[in-house]
Amino acid sequence: MSVLQVVLYPDDRLTKVCEPVTQVDDELNQFIDDMFDTMYQEGGIGLAASQVGVLKRVITIDIEGDKTNQVVLINPEILESCGETGIEEGCLSIPGYRALVPRKEKITVKALNRQGEEVIYHADDLFAICIQHEIDHLNGIVFVDHISNLKRQRIKDKMQKLKKQLYRSKA
């Protein structure tokens, strides 16, 4: 198992729509383990494959962060949604920034699990918000796409400066 490099906004890979997974196999399961390792290392509760540069429709979630309730969603699809909610969301690809994002309060999502079996989750509250946030990533949307252009541009400018500083410190 290994920790993967998290892609930082405004990297173009975060704007790409991810491809469906066509085969659930040992290689994919190793990647999923690496995604969980990365998510825990970075202190997140959810991670989309595109956030580590892999443009496949795979999500890992662990709301509690204690490794006892890990959720894997492969090729997730929201079937139903209702209600309105929102919290200040953060993102591993945009460290240090948060914004209020409108979301559906309850959702029903269909996906494959890591064994390739179809699963259905009826999610609400933080679990529903996290699923929607990560599915946005699979569709090339980051949470700052939900805020004003001015705020988004400020964050983009600051993130580009941060990326340059990180690049210089590694050189």
UniProtKB/Swiss-Prot annotation:
Keywords: Hydrolase, Iron, Metal-binding, Protein biosynthesis. GO terms for biological process: co-translational protein modification; translation. Its cofactor is Fe(2+). SUPFAM superfamilies: Peptide deformylase. NCBIfam families: pept_deformyl, PRK00150.1-3. The keyword NAD does not apply. It comes from Haemophilus ducreyi (strain 35000HP / ATCC 700724). Belongs to the polypeptide deformylase family. The active site is at 134. Fe cation binds at residues 91, 133, 137. Disulfide bonds: none annotated. It catalyses: N-terminal N-formyl-L-methionyl-[peptide] + H2O = N-terminal L-methionyl-[peptide] + formate. One of its GO terms (molecular function) is metal ion binding. The keyword Iron applies. This is Peptide deformylase. InterPro entries: Peptide_deformylase, Peptide_deformylase_sf. Pfam families: Pep_deformylase. Binds 1 Fe(2+) ion. Removes the formyl group from the N-terminal Met of newly synthesized proteins. Requires at least a dipeptide for an efficient rate of reaction. N-terminal L-methionine is a prerequisite for activity but the enzyme has broad specificity at other positions. Its EC number is 3.5.1.88. The gene is def.
